[in-house]
């Protein structure tokens, strides 16, 4: 989306319209210019300070102040994309479509990206927002045939430049969410069609707990981490996230909620934590749970770096101690997710 800052996106991983073809944003960094704790400025790349380069690919702001990114660019003219809104009677077909995309379509056509979100929209009730993007100026490519066959109540898809399409994506939330309070949460699972239905049904079963709160607009999204994305993560020695093609395809369940009254925060947080707990329990029972937590969607009650796996955490800590022996960025730099301190707030509602 247009308001997202590039540095944080890249340091936390970075999912884009092009991830199915090229990997995440962190996998397409040629080099980082970093001011280390000692004041030494280094350029980390696959051939220089390679250990620091690896750590910065998903390790967040734990290793220094990144002052410059050099990214591997590629030519892009116009592309196609946008979003379509579907009513509740289409939910089974929408879930079938994202399942087929995650397991089959995304491997056959790496130019494609697809995210499905669910919410209660004022005046419309239960809706599914399907965001589809294609890295060519081709409308309704065959990889999206299952979605193309459905009849939306709103369709703003079209051909345009990347900047136009990212601005258009902001239309996925009510206009009055600007200035609201906001919280995001996520969890990851093996792609499973039954779990898709379970998480959507769980979300709507709990909506009454928050639907009457002032300005409340919660959503839940299914974002596939495709075979192409997982393969792209292995470039240049791999990243720090601990994900491999053997673990896929997987998907991120991303939940967000905007609201306007600070007094409602506890209710909103309890609503989201309850969904997480219920879906995690169901996924574990089905054998499709995955520990990974995407840093850029994580709440303050989560520890994304721990989800990278014990070996990667140990390696990240080693890199941190090498370039920051006094642990300035672990102990004096406030905020965000540290390497081995757990969730910023360990008291999940």
Regions found by a protein language model. Give the residues of each.
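Soluble FAD-dependent oxygen oxidases
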Residues: 1-349
């Amino acid at each position: 989306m247009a308001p997202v800052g590039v540095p944080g996106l890249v340091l936390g991983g970075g999912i884009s319209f092009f991830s199915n073809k090229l990997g995440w944003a962190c996998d397409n960094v040629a080099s980082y210019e970093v001011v280390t704790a000692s004041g030494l400025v280094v350029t980390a790349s696959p051939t220089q300070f390679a250990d620091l380069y690896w750590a910065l690919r998903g390790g967040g702001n734990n290793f220094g102040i990144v002052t410059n990114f050099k990214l591997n660019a590629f030519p892009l003219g116009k592309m196609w994309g946008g979003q379509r809104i579907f009513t509740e009677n289409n939910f089974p077909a929408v879930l079938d479509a994202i399942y087929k995309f995650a397991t089959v379509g995304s491997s056959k056509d790496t130019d494609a990206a697809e995210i499905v979100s669910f919410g209660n929209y004022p005046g419309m009730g239960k809706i599914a927002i399907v965001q589809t993007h294609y890295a060519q100026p081709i409308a309704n490519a065959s990889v999206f045939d299952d979605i193309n066959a459905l009849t939306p109540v709103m369709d703003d898809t079209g051909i345009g430049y990347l900047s136009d399409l990212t601005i258009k994506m902001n239309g996925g939330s009510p206009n009055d969410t600007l200035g609201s309070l906001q919280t995001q949460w996520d969890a990851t699972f093996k792609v499973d069609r039954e779990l898709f239905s379970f998480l959507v049904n769980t979300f709507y079963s709990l909506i009454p707990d928050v639907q009457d709160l002032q300005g409340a607009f919660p959503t839940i999204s299914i974002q596939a981490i495709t075979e192409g994305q997982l393969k792209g993560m292995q470039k240049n020695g791999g990243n720090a996230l601990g994900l491999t093609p053997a673990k896929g395809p997987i998907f991120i369940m991303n939940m967000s909620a905007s609201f306007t009254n600070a007094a409602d925060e506890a209710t909103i947080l309890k609503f989201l934590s309850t969904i997480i707990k219920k879906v995690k329990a169901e996924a574990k029972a089905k054998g499709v749970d995955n520990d990974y937590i995407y840093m850029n969607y994580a709440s303050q009650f989560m520890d994304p770096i721990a989800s990278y796996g014990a070996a990667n955490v140990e390696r990240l800590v080693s890199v941190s101690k090498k370039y920051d022996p006094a642990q300035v960025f672990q102990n004096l730099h406030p905020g965000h997710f540290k390497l081995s301190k757990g969730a910023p707030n360990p008291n999940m509602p």
